[in-house]
Amino acid sequence: MIRNQYYGTGRRKSASARVFLRFGNGDIVINNLSLDKYFPKDNFQIIIKKPLEVTNVLNILDAYITVIGGGVSGQAGAISHGITRALLQYNAEFKSVLRATGLMTRDSRMVERKKVGLRKARRSPQFSKR
């Protein structure tokens, strides 16, 4: 049975993305803005398009995305992770290709907490000999 919409949730750092894939001509809309307007820099656009390019469905599916939290890098990673999960619902045979490129793995690195007595997570106060 062919569905008209495929859903995937992606997370990275403190960003969370909800991705809906539909049949279309390759448009990517993020929070009601085009990909070029939401991410003007090319490096983030490449990260987002990578799952679609690896599976050769860039011009077949449209992506409608809502993303909240985090910064631009975390949001781009969350969107990429969400697109990957939605592509698996679209076609489970993509799993080996996506796994080989490292797109299926959730990047679990988070910001380290600030410790008491330190200026940052690991940065100690300036040392004065005298």
Curated annotation (Swiss-Prot):
MF terms (GO), sorted A to Z: RNA binding; structural constituent of ribosome
InterPro entries: Ribosomal_Su5_D2-typ_SF, Ribosomal_uS9, Ribosomal_uS9_bac/plastid, Ribosomal_uS9_CS, Ribsml_uS5_D2-typ_fold_subgr
Keywords: Ribonucleoprotein, Ribosomal protein
Pfam families in the cross-refs: Ribosomal_S9
PROSITE patterns (alphabetical): RIBOSOMAL_S9 (PS00360)
GO biological process, one term: translation
Top-level taxon of the source organism: Bacteria
A cellular-component GO term for this protein: cytosolic small ribosomal subunit
SUPFAM superfamilies, A to Z: Ribosomal protein S5 domain 2-like
Disulphide bridges, residue numbers: none
Matching NCBIfam families: PRK00132.1
PANTHER family, sorted: RIBOSOMAL PROTEIN S9, SMALL RIBOSOMAL SUBUNIT PROTEIN US9M
Similarity remark: Belongs to the universal ribosomal protein uS9 family.
Record protein name field: Small ribosomal subunit protein uS9
Species assigned in the record: Blochmanniella floridana
